């Protein structure tokens, strides 16, 4: 099997009431951990590359790592996606370089400017057999080079989605319903605290999601900033020398609810970073004399695999859907 687009993935997900996980990749261990979990659980998967990851690891290295994962896991569909492309030139480079899906994120621009840039990318992508994700509404938070300060985010306006999709021809739409990028998704002022002192985030705006679904029947919706920031990993990071106070994410039960609706793609990045970093910190604390990268990257890779398997089974619902 070769790399696929997300077209068939999303159709099956929409009809089946589940979502496909889109996991950000930066190196070999992350690619292996994600695809080993997806392969064993017979789940479709999207491997996505940000502008920052591309600068860090090099376009060619990342593409070849993903192609190797396809060879090693021929029984599952794998798509290679550009996350948060911010220019036509970046999207074009990825389209020309083997990606099967790209996102053009012009959500910070005016409505008309967003339409114009998205349409330009769509026309080029479709001519080359590549699908396009666009975005309406703006998420707060920090992830790679995507930075939006709290208070500057904006929910998607459902009354705009039909016109936007019709005029751009995009294949899926990322909307803003209260998710946020990074491990610090919400300020303390936005949350309450539970009995253990852990921040409890405000609920997602399912009313916005449901209105978008009503206006775009059968159309794939995407959620960005959907890491749950598992507290066991936050605790591990802090226990072994880290400092991540009040890191909090999106409750998994809310993501599971979204996946049963029209949300066909759920983006997860920070949870991978936390799983790896927590386990690497723990390893060095327990083995201060070790220096072989294979020694500490092996448990980090396993942590990624276990975390992705959990997401596939209990959040996305995509196990057995390859």
Regions picked out by a protein language model, each given a short descriptive name:
Residues 5-21, 290-291:
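Generic N-terminal amphipathic, Lys/Arg-enriched alpha-helix
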């Amino acid at each position: 099997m070769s790399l696929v687009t997300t077209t068939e993935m999303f159709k099956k997900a929409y009809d089946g009431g589940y979502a496909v996980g889109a996991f950000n990749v930066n190196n070999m261990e992350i690619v292996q951990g994600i695809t080993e979990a997806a392969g064993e659980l017979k789940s479709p998967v999207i491997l996505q590359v940000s502008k920052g990851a591309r600068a860090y690891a090099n376009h060619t290295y990342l593409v070849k790592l993903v192609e190797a994962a396809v060879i090693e896991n021929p029984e599952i569909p794998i798509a290679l996606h550009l996350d948060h492309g911010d220019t036509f030139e970046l999207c074009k480079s990825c389209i020309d370089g083997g990606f099967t899906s790209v996102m053009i994120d012009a959500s910070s621009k005016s409505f008309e400017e967003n339409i114009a840039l998205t349409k330009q990318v769509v026309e080029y992508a479709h001519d080359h057999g590549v699908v396009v994700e666009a975005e309406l509404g703006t998420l707060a938070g920090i992830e790679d080079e995507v930075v939006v300060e709290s208070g500057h985010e904006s929910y998607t306006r459902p009354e705009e989605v039909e016109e936007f999709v019709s005029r751009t021809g995009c294949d899926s739409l990322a909307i803003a319903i209260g998710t946020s990028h990074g491990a610090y998704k919400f300020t303390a002022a936005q949350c309450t605290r539970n009995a253990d002192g852990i921040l409890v985030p405000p609920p997602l705006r399912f009313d916005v999601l449901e209105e978008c679904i009503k206006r775009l029947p059968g159309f794939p919706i995407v959620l960005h900033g959907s890491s749950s920031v598992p507290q066991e990993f936050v605790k591990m990071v802090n226990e072994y020398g880290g400092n991540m106070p009040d890191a909090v994410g999106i409750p998994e039960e809310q993501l599971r609810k979204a996946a049963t609706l029209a949300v066909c793609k759920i983006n997860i990045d920070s949870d991978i970073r936390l799983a790896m970093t927590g386990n690497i910190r723990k390893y060095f604390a327990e083995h201060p004399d070790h220096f072989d990268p294979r020694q500490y990257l092996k448990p980090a890779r396993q942590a990624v695999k276990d975390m992705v398997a959990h997401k596939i089974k209990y959040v996305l619902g995509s196990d057995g859907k390859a």
